[in-house]
Swiss-Prot record:
Protein name from the UniProt record: 3D-(3,5/4)-trihydroxycyclohexane-1,2-dione hydrolase
Region (Thiamine pyrophosphate binding): 441-521
Pathway where it operates: Polyol metabolism; myo-inositol degradation into acetyl-CoA; acetyl-CoA from myo-inositol: step 3/7
Cofactor(s) needed: Mg(2+); thiamine diphosphate
Keywords of this entry: Hydrolase, Magnesium, Metal-binding, NAD, Thiamine pyrophosphate
Any one cellular-component term (Gene Ontology): acetolactate synthase complex
InterPro entries per record: DHS-like_NAD/FAD-binding_dom, Myo_inos_IolD, THcHDO_hydrolase_firmi, THDP-binding, Thiamin_PyroP_enz_cen_dom, Thiamin_PyroP_enz_TPP-bd_dom, TPP-bd_CS, TPP_enz
EC number(s) given by UniProt: 3.7.1.22
Pfam families on file: TPP_enzyme_C, TPP_enzyme_M, TPP_enzyme_N
GO term, biological process aspect, one: L-valine biosynthetic process
Length: 643
């Protein structure tokens, strides 16, 4: 048996460089690089290995550990989970910074390999810099906090443990049903320790991503339900995207006259113009999809995990005879809502089910309902994209501090409404441009309003809805598809939370366009707060008022364009639609990352359509408005499904 004496870190780099995946006969390299922010717990171990021989791995320099891990997540998502960039950090705060990103990847079922440094396995110098000491367990370190948010976790306390740790890491990372974040903690002394690693550990490994078919019994159980239903609706989830089953789903839906509602993860898997595509469904869904869903007697969940936003907290489907059928690689997700399930690959299962339904001569009983619903939404879209600020302007959102809008208007001199801005952006950017989003009111507006004919051009992280994902993810998406324009669409709140990877985009010459919607606050949470009878507390960006000692002073103005220009971005400020249009046109000509500071009037985002969201309201309050909100919530909850 041949072996090579190497340090643990050197062996790790060599192993990662030899990982490949195969899908539909196409073989691709799996690990394309590694993000790192070197600290004392990683630089002389893994850092030495990468300096001496990085092999085929490109080393990227992050600016914030959470940010670089979000970029890696987006890179994997935009590559349909078949390519990754690993992330390494020092011990302590560097590692802890990646926990949020790990949770984001796991919730969204995106492969993310994290390699945080750790304290000494020998414990000789304990407590080392940045080490947490727990008197009840000296084996606990910061990295233990990754356990709840990862799909696989391991710590390499001896060099030879690296082999089983990495084999299992790859097992999870390349499993479509179980993938998510993987954490392999690397004690800093072990990184530099050597071992005679067998050559077979470094052999080229091709991880086959297969298309398993559900068992025949499951198909026929589902068939017996479907063929007796008159008004089914399909929910298109992220599984459609990752199975590359968009065309198959479109063919299926059009053949059997079944309308489709899109989740955030499923959007852009099929064309917006598809005759059966109603658009976004659920809490952030549009009028067309939610109206059809209310009367549906069958819900066919395809590659979806049925989040509360998709099901409107299980209140959306009001037909008393409604049943659920699912297609999903994950038995866990397929079993939700007492569904009759087909556990298997989306594309393969749809093709098999197509043949069975065709033999039954099945067709839904919809007549003009689908067309009428789409037409009604088309008319609503015209209104939304043409909302203009005028004298005595009344914004879409009615629950508000009436003075805020005029105060913001006076402060910024803007006339831009959020929905009209989105309409203009859609008109101006390339048809195949990738948009990236995650948090605030914009994901709701985008799920409702954004239309695209370009496959996988809608990149929304709405499983964890992580503020700060957008810009880092825009960079990651650009790394994945450098030939396309990428637009990170986010609010001022999210921008302030995390935008450090803009510098990395400059460093790597990978252009990201930032569309920053500034409404001087956390707008969507202000909506949620005030619509449930609560006062306007700490959701607008205001100075502290010396007289009241509360955060109800004047609005805080920020020149985001000026600040970003200091980083080296090409920047613009838009206060009217003409300025926005000119900025969008000019930004396309730039080779460097850009930022458009769009001053948007508060409360001009879209509102909900025929949906409800269950949030934890106070049962008792001195304010009648809060009590009323609780009673309304209680009333809807009675009719919602219990699990």
């Amino acid at each position: 048996m041949k072996s090579t004496k190497m340090t643990t870190a050197q062996a790790l780099v060599k192993f990662l460089d030899n990982q490949y995946v195969s899908f539909d006969g196409k073989e691709e390299k799996f690990v394309h690089g590694i993000f790192t922010i070197f600290g004392h717990g990683i630089v002389v171990g893994l850092g030495q290995a990468l300096d001496e021989n990085p092999r085929g791995l490109k080393v990227y320099q992050g600016r914030n550990e959470q940010g670089m891990a979000h970029a890696a997540t987006a890179f994997a998502k935009q590559n349909n989970r078949r390519k990754i960039i690993a992330c390494s950090s020092s011990i302590g705060p560097g590692a802890a910074n990646m926990v949020t990103a790990a949770a984001t990847a796991t919730v969204n079922n995106i492969p993310l390999l994290l390699l945080p440094g750790d304290s000494f396995a020998t414990r000789q110098p304990d407590p080392v810099l940045q080490q947490i000491e727990q008197s009840y367990n000296l084996g606990i370190t910061t990295n233990d906090v990754f356990k709840p948010v990862c799909k696989y976790w391991d710590r390499v306390n001896r060099p030879e443990q690296l082999m089983s740790a990495m084999i299992n890491a790859m097992r999870v990372l390349t499993d479509p049903a179980e993938t998510g974040a993987v954490c392999i903690a690397l004690p800093q002394d072990v990184q530099g320790e050597s071992f005679e690693f067998p050559e077979y550990f470094f052999k080229k490994r091709v991880h086959k991503i297969t298309r398993p078919l559900a068992v025949e019994e499951e198909f026929y159980e589902c068939l017996n339900i479907i063929k007796n239903k008159k008004k089914p609706i399909i929910i298109c989830g992220g599984g459609v995207r990752y199975s590359e089953a968009g065309d198959t789903l479109s063919k299926f839906a059009n053949r059997f006259n079944i309308p489709i509602g899109e989740t955030q993860a499923g959007k852009s898997s099929i064309k917006s113009s598809d005759l059966m595509n109603l658009g976004g469904i659920g809490v952030t869904g549009n009028l067309a999809a939610n109206i059809i869903a209310k009367d549906a007697d069958l819900v066919i969940g395809v590659g979806t995990r049925f989040s509360d936003f998709t099901t409107a907290s299980k209140s959306l489907f009001e037909n008393p005879d409604v049943e659920f059928v699912t297609i999903n690689l994950s038995k866990f997700h397929a079993s939700k809502l007492d569904s009759c399930k087909m556990v298997g690959d989306v594309k393969e299962c749809l093709e098999y089910l197509y043949k069975l339904l065709e033999k039954e001569n099945y067709i839904s009983s919809y007549k003009d309902e689908i067309k009428d619903a789409k037409m009604a939404w088309k008319e609503e879209m015209k209104k939304l994209t043409n909302i203009k600020y005028e004298e005595n302007f009344d914004p879409i959102i009615k629950f508000r501090n009436k003075e805020s809008l005029e105060e913001f208007k006076k402060l910024t001199d803007t006339t831009i409404t959020q929905t009209s801005a989105l309409g203009l952006i859609r008109e101006c950017i390339d048809n195949d441009a990738i948009i990236v989003g995650a948090s605030g009111s914009l994901p709701g507006d985008l799920q409702r309003m954004w239309e695209t004919e370009s496959l996988n051009s809608y990149h929304m992280e709405y499983g964890y809805s992580c503020m700060g994902y957008e810009i880092a993810a825009g960079f990651g998406a650009k790394l994945a598809e450098p030939e396309k324009e990428v637009y990170s669409i986010l609010g001022d709140g999210s921008y302030l939370m995390l935008h450090s990877e803009l510098i990395t985009s400059i460093q790597e010459n990978k252009k990201v366009n930032v569309l920053l919607f500034d409404n001087c606050g956390f707008g969507c949470i202000n909506n949620l707060q005030m619509s449930n009878g609560i006062g306007n507390l700490a959701t607008e960006f205001r100075y502290r008022n010396d007289e009241t000692n509360k955060l109800n002073g004047k609005l805080i103005p920020i020149d985001f364009a000026k600040a970003a220009a200091g980083y080296g971005l090409k920047t613009y400020t838009a206060k009217n639609l003409e300025e926005l249009k000119n900025a969008l046109i000019d930004a396309k000509k730039q080779r460097v990352s850009t930022l458009i500071d769009i001053k948007v009037l508060p409360k001009t985002m879209t509102d909900g359509y025929e949906s409800w969201w269950h949030v934890g309201l106070a049962e008792v309050s001195e304010k009648e408005s809060v009590n009323k909100a609780f009673e309304n919530n209680k009333k809807v909850l009675k009719s919602a499904r219990k699990y």
